């Protein structure tokens, strides 16, 4: 009798799990209620991807996130958001301080599906569109309405697309774009930052972009771009990591000027970029070191340190070399 009762209870629970509104129903993903524009110097937030523990993530100035619902109960200063990591294009969720974002209405910007239709081409395919993740950034354009810059990509796509949407008659239209092969980029850009470097209100888009010339040669470039006359213009491009161990010269020699050693055979170069104010302009500074290697030795035989300020000439920043 007990066995029959147990079987009956299990059958009842199984049936209830398929009834709408029953306790067997899976929790629905929260729907966006607004947009959140990350302002100021950006924000450090504890976000998590699906199934992972929360990790400290930096949301840079200019990032556009979705507001999902209020954060912790009883805390009016906390809000739950959805964001996309530009390096992996993986969706993340978590709580941040409400004071660190500017709330914008949901109808101010098109949905992801609407943006993909504006781009057209391969994104009109339903399967491709469903597997595409969109990371968003706002670029202020002086007195003009801001432009929307998006990273479009996914693990099954051959390249990640950097797509600009320009304001036109109160709407957004697809503007210039760049493609990055996923064989080099993995999925997204290693880092993204938005800053007004020139002081005219026309914000720049700063990115760290990996490159590869083979298993023993590759690194990452640091690029500063901004929108001018409806196009993405490169204002500065320098390597901040450059490993070239495909060849080793028999007798390494330090070239002059020192920056000419960056990327030379048998060297590893690493640098950080700082910005120094000069009037209204923030000038980039390349600070790093080039290490020289010989075949068969793990440690460098010599190194040279470099620090170079690259001033603004009115159109672009001076090249490193």
Each language-model region and where it sits:
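Bacterial N-terminal signal peptides that target proteins for export
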Residues: 1-9
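Bacterial N-terminal signal peptides
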Residues: 8-18
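Acidic, small-residue rich beta-repeat scaffolds with periodic aromatic anchors
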Residues: 24-30, 34, 53, 62-65, ...
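SH3/SH3-like beta-barrel superfamily modules
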Residues: 33, 57-98
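SH3/SH3-like (including bacterial SH3b) beta-barrel domains
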Residues: 47-61
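Short consensus segments that form the blades of beta-propeller domains
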Residues: 56, 86-87, 151-156, 183, ...
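Terminal domain-start segments
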Residues: 102-189, 317-321
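Acidic/hydrophobic-patterned starts of short beta strands in beta-sheet-rich repeat architectures
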Residues: 137-153, 196-211, 271-289
């Amino acid at each position: 009798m007990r066995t029959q009762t147990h079987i009956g209870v299990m059958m009842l629970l199984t049936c209830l799990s398929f009834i709408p509104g029953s306790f067997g129903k899976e929790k629905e993903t929260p729907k966006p209620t607004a947009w959140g524009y990350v302002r100021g110097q950006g924000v450090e937030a504890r976000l998590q991807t699906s199934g992972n523990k929360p990790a400290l993530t930096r949301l840079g100035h200019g990032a556009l996130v979705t507001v999902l619902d209020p954060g912790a109960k009883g805390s009016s200063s906390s809000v739950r958001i959805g964001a996309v990591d530009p390096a992996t294009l993986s969706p993340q969720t978590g709580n941040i301080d409400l004071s660190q974002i500017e709330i914008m209405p949901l109808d101010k910007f098109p949905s992801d599906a609407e943006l993909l239709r504006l781009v057209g081409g391969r994104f009109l395919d339903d399967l491709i569109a469903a597997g595409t993740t969109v990371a968003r950034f706002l670029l202020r354009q002086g007195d003009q309405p801001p432009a929307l810059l998006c990273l479009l990509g996914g693990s099954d796509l051959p390249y990640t697309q950097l797509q600009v949407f320009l304001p036109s008659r109160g709407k957004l239209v697809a503007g210039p774009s760049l493609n990055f092969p996923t064989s080099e980029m993995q999925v997204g850009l290693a880092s993204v930052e938005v800053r007004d470097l020139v002081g005219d209100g026309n914000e720049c888009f700063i990115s760290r972009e990996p490159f590869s010339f083979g298993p023993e040669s590759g690194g990452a470039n640091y690029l500063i771009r901004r929108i001018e006359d409806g196009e993405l213009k490169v204002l500065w491009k320098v390597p901040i990591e450059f490993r070239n161990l495909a060849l080793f010269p028999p007798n390494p020699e330090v070239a002059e000027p020192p920056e000419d050693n960056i990327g030379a055979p048998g060297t590893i170069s690493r640098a950080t970029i700082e910005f120094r104010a000069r009037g209204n302009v923030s000038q980039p500074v390349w600070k790093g070191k080039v290490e020289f290697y010989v075949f068969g030795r793990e440690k460098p035989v010599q190194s040279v340190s470099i620090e170079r300020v690259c001033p603004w000439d009115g159109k672009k920043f001076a090249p490193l070399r």
